[in-house]
UniProtKB/Swiss-Prot annotation:
Keyword Secreted tagged: no
Official protein name in the record: Leukotriene C4 synthase
UniProt pathway: Lipid metabolism; leukotriene C4 biosynthesis
GO molecular function: enzyme activator activity; glutathione peroxidase activity; glutathione transferase activity; identical protein binding; leukotriene-C4 synthase activity; lipid binding
Broad class of where this protein is predominantly found: nucleus
Effect of substituting N55A: Does not affect leukotriene-C4 synthase activity but substantially increased KM for GSH
Gene: LTC4S
InterPro entries the UniProt entry points to: 5_LipOase_AP, FLAP/GST2/LTC4S_CS, MAPEG, MAPEG-like_dom_sf, Membr-assoc_MAPEG
Protein's organism: Homo sapiens
Disease note: LTC4 synthase deficiency is associated with a neurometabolic developmental disorder characterized by muscular hypotonia, psychomotor retardation, failure to thrive, and microcephaly.
Processing after translation: Phosphorylation at Ser-36 by RPS6KB1 inhibits the leukotriene-C4 synthase activity.
Binding site for glutathione: R30, R51, A52, Q53, V54, N55, E58, Y59, Y93, F94, Q95, G96, Y97
Length: 150
């Protein structure tokens, strides 16, 4: 069982570490711009770091759920790769947003595409799981013909 989900677990742990990094950046920005909790407003430089962290945190549960469903029901490697792309895009998003609101846009779109791909993989995997066995075998046979490397 562990071998079947090791990549998903590694990407999950990397995601948790990335969330911790974002939180530490907010703590650092609070000190640099003298914004004490519970305040969430201050100079624009602080607010951008704060918003970037909050935005990343808001999407993290969606990311985790789709990562695991796609990895278990579709393909672990494909889901893990999409997960890595998503996390890298979120890191770039955070770094860009910390510098300027405009610099967040390209990584935001990249992370959204990766997340939607995970949603699609999860949905396809679940659909295949619930199809009758004969229909599933026929569809997988055709898919293997079209995509021999898969």
């Amino acid at each position: 069982m562990k071998d079947e989900v090791a990549l998903l677990a590694a990407v999950t742990l990397l995601g948790v570490l990335l969330q911790a990094y974002f939180s530490l950046q907010v703590i650092s920005a609070r000190r640099a711009f003298r914004v004490s909790p519970p305040l969430t407003t201050g100079p624009p430089e602080f607010e951008r770091v704060y918003r970037a962290q909050v935005n990343c945190s808001e999407y993290f549960p969606l990311f985790l759920a789709t990562l695991w469903v796609a990895g278990i029901f579709f393909h672990e490697g494909a889901a893990a790769l999409c997960g890595l792309v998503y996390l890298f895009a979120r890191l770039r998003y955070f770094q860009g947003y910390a510098r300027s609101a405009q610099l967040r846009l390209a990584p935001l779109y990249a992370s959204a595409r990766a997340l939607w791909l995970l949603v699609a993989l999860a949905a396809l995997g679940l659909l295949a799981h619930f199809l009758p066995a004969a229909l599933r075998a026929a569809l997988l046979g055709r898919l293997r013909t079209l995509l021999p490397w898969a």
